């Protein structure tokens, strides 16, 4: 082995150790910080999942209670087919809608009586016909729902 080869070998070996040491000094702290932050992300993800699951459990427990409460509240609402006047007689809903669409002013209601059962009572006069107006007849007819309830209220948990 020549002297020149020997000097080049030591130069490359020293360069390798210097560059390796500088890289270790500069890179290893960033790698350690990266590992620390990655650990923090994993821990935060774990607690995020844990808090989501606990919130979902609380939500699932109260959904049934809320559905039952809403169902009981809905059962307390009187049917919308007939409206009670304060005198006790009923108003046909179709005639009331026909009056609403036939009248020139849509605010033709009066407030009579007092108490929770009194409300806006339409002024029904001779202009109300038994057949609905063309505007009302053009509206789509909603099919009457059966007595069996479907959907989220009846499905439970």
Swiss-Prot record:
Keyword presence, Transmembrane: yes
Extracellular compartment segments: 29
Keywords for the protein's UniProt record, in alphabetical order: Membrane, Sporulation, Transmembrane, Transmembrane helix
GO terms (BP aspect): sporulation resulting in formation of a cellular spore
Residues covered by region (Disordered): 104-157
Keyword Membrane: yes
Membrane topology (Cytoplasmic): 1-7, 51-157
UniProt subcellular location: Membrane
Listed transmembrane segments: 8-28, 30-50
GO cellular component: membrane
Biased composition regions of type Polar residues, renumbered to the chain: 104-115
Pfam families for the chain: Osw5
Entry membrane topology: Multi-pass membrane protein
Signal peptide: none
Role noted for this protein: Involved in spore wall assembly.
Name assigned to this protein: Outer spore wall protein 5
Lineage of source species: Eukaryota, Fungi, Dikarya, Ascomycota, Saccharomycotina
């Amino acid at each position: 082995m020549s002297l020149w080869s020997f000097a080049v070998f030591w130069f490359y070996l020293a360069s390798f150790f210097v560059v390796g040491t500088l890289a270790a000094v500069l890179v290893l702290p960033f790698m350690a910080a990266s590992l620390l932050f990655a650990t923090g992300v994993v821990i935060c993800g774990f607690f995020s999942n844990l808090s989501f699951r606990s919130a979902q459990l609380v939500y699932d427990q109260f959904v049934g209670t809320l559905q039952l409460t809403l169902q009981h509240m809905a059962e307390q609402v009187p049917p919308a087919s007939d409206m009670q006047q304060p005198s006790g007689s009923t108003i046909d809903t179709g005639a009331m809608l026909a009056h609403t669409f036939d009248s020139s002013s849509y605010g033709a209601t009066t407030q009579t009586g007092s108490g929770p059962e009194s409300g806006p009572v339409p002024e029904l006069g001779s202009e109300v016909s038994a057949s609905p107006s063309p505007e009302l007849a053009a509206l789509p007819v909603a099919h009457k729902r059966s007595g069996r309830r479907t959907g989220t209220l009846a499905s439970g948990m």
